[in-house]
Amino acid sequence: MALKRIQKELQDLGRDPPAQCSAGPVGDDLFHWQATIMGPPESPYQGGVFFLTIHFPTDYPFKPPKVAFTTRIYHPNINSNGSICLDILRSQWSPALTISKVLLSICSLLCDPNPDDPLVPEIARIYKTDRERYNQLAREWTQKYAM
């Protein structure tokens, strides 16, 4: 079941890739993918290329994939291990969701952080109290780690 579904998603991604994103298997292992997300225009991540790993559980799509950034990023919902605080990767997962939709959700999280549900409270605090400084630090990290 999982393998068939993953193969279908891979085909769909090839036919209709989401904007600013790409993903595919690492070698022959269809349960382990690498993805890239281009820093969205008009965001402090613009111009950066961010790499992520995707691990599919054997009971996919009934359980969510494990998705993590391997590129460092300054963001209130993404910690230094690359873990992402995103409801659809946890409690709000649904088998109707696809990797394409997950990547688009992560892209929109880059444009619109959720400082009220932070993984990194300090970054969330700066985001809420000093947006200029947040944008500057996010740009610096993007230049340092993602270019």
Swiss-Prot record:
It is an enzyme of class 2 (transferase). Pfam families: UQ_con. GO terms for molecular function: ATP binding; ubiquitin conjugating enzyme activity; ubiquitin protein ligase binding; ubiquitin-protein transferase activity. Expressed in the nervous system. It comes from the Eukaryota. Its main location: nucleus. Transmembrane segments: none annotated. The active site is at C85. SMART domains: UBCc (SM00212). The keyword Nucleus applies. One of its GO terms (biological process) is programmed cell death involved in cell development. One of its GO terms (cellular component) is nucleus. Changing P61S: In ns770; Viable. Inappropriate survival of male gonadal linker cell; exacerbated on a heat shock transcription factor hsf-1 mutant background. It is found in: Nucleus; Chromosome; Cytoplasm. Its EC number is 2.3.2.23. It catalyses: S-ubiquitinyl-[E1 ubiquitin-activating enzyme]-L-cysteine + [E2 ubiquitin-conjugating enzyme]-L-cysteine = [E1 ubiquitin-activating enzyme]-L-cysteine + S-ubiquitinyl-[E2 ubiquitin-conjugating enzyme]-L-cysteine. PANTHER family: UBIQUITIN-CONJUGATING ENZYME E2. Belongs to the ubiquitin-conjugating enzyme family. Interacts with the brc-1-brd-1 heterodimer following ionizing irradiation. Catalyzes the covalent attachment of ubiquitin to other proteins. Mediates the selective degradation of short-lived and abnormal proteins. Plays a role in the DNA damage response. In particular, in response to ionizing radiation, associates with the E3 ubiquitin-protein ligase brc-1-brd-1 heterodimer on chromatin to activate E3-ubiquitin ligase activity of the heterodimer, and thus its DNA damage repair mechanisms. This is Ubiquitin-conjugating enzyme E2 2. It comes from Caenorhabditis elegans.
